Amino acid sequence: MEPLAPMRLYTLSKRHFVLVFVVFFICFGLTIFVGIRGPKVIQTSAANFSLNNSKKLKPIQILSNPLSTYNQQLWLTCVVELDQSKETSIKTSFPMTVKVDGVAQDGTTMYIHNKVHNRTRTLTCAGKCAEIIVAHLGYLNYTQYTVIVGFEHLKLPIKGMNFTWKTYNPAFSRLEIWFRFFFVVLTFIVTCLFAHSLRKFSMRDWGIEQKWMSVLLPLLLLYNDPFFPLSFLVNSWLPGMLDDLFQSMFLCALLLFWLCVYHGIRVQGERKCLTFYLPKFFIVGLLWLASVTLGIWQTVNELHDPMYQYRVDTGNFQGMKVFFMVVAAVYILYLLFLIVRACSELRHMPYVDLRLKFLTALTFVVLVISIAILYLRFGAQVLQDNFVAELSTHYQNSAEFLSFYGLLNFYLYTLAFVYSPSKNALYESQLKDNPAFSMLNDSDDDVIYGSDYEEMPLQNGQAIRAKYKEESDSD
């Protein structure tokens, strides 16, 4: 058995464990309540056109409302209304042209992309036509935009077209700034307290959970993104890409943490890089590579073409999606194998069993809540084409944003609390390291939770004398 720095987990009673979970749920519930009361994420403004049943469509020029950096991004979508029976189903492809111009504050027109972009889009109508994304700007350089859209090659009887501008709600942007700042400050404090509590113990004596927490807490700081306000100060794609990169790094590190802990808690002593870490890094690294590739791919292509959508314009997207799902399935099976094996082998070891049960219980709660949030957001179509794309930094309401951030932050804070040593941990560890004092005449429950006799007051020595007399009589 490897020497371990003590954890507060060992000194908690059953009552304290219940209190830890209650505090976790209260904090998580507060974030959801604030999110429900918060503003909408997306604000829209519509511009409708009557085309008088003309089959010859001319280019349509659309001017956006005045924008600020708090609008973050800009989408232009279109819903086509056909002049035919609603029972008719149509699916046809047609080339669509788009030209985007920026309007400066003095009213002059600046050419963002001094050319007309041409992409093939699919119009799907079953009673009502599906929405088409015309253009998307990942960051805003100008206070207003003009988009010229061409549907000249759409050979269908058109009754009308409904164009909609979509941007982030400035009120939500301010909420996002303040709550990210709150979590950044709170995570920094928790990280410092956790490091301070372990300062008296050699890193060689840290448990695998404590070592991983020293990695996850700084990554959680990046996940909350202290550089996020730069996206409102600098007109650049870099802050948004950094945010995507930080999120993918933390989430994949969390996946790696689960694999390493459930395996490492069973393999005490030296953990070789080749046999212990390499397979886990390989599986999680593939997931990280797939998510980062899609994010960078989308960002770089949108810089040159506002019509670009990797779900529509990338022939390899289906292959990427299948690859991601296969690797995710391998990860889940491997994790379940490690959990089942650890639970079967360590269920009779008091200290290790306690670590295993607590991590499994809290992680199970977090995963159930996460799956519930995803189901409420996507419904039964959670594994359709929009799944990977929508799991990025885009949210549909404030409650969704705060629930995800609050869930992961409070999960790490709870783990940091139970894995950090208590105030008297150094003295207690010195006693436990001495075989003469370690678990002498104590059962497993007494060691973890304390016996009733230990909590009994001395009563001027009467209790001890009475116990000694009973033992003498029995002899």
Swiss-Prot record:
The chain crosses the membrane at residues 16-36, 131-151, 175-195, 214-234, 245-265, 276-296, 320-340, 356-376, 401-421. Signal peptide: none annotated. The keyword Metal-binding does not apply. Mediates action of cytolethal distending toxins (CDT), which are secreted by many pathogenic bacteria. Expression level of TMEM181 is rate-limiting for intoxication. One of its GO terms (molecular function) is toxic substance binding. The keyword Transport does not apply. It is a multi-pass membrane protein. Pfam families: TMEM181_GOLD, WLS-like_TM. GO terms for cellular component: membrane. Belongs to the TMEM181 family. Keywords: Membrane, Phosphoprotein, Transmembrane, Transmembrane helix. It is found in: Membrane. Interacts with cytolethal distending toxin. It comes from the Eukaryota. The modification Phosphoserine is found at residue 443. This is Transmembrane protein 181.
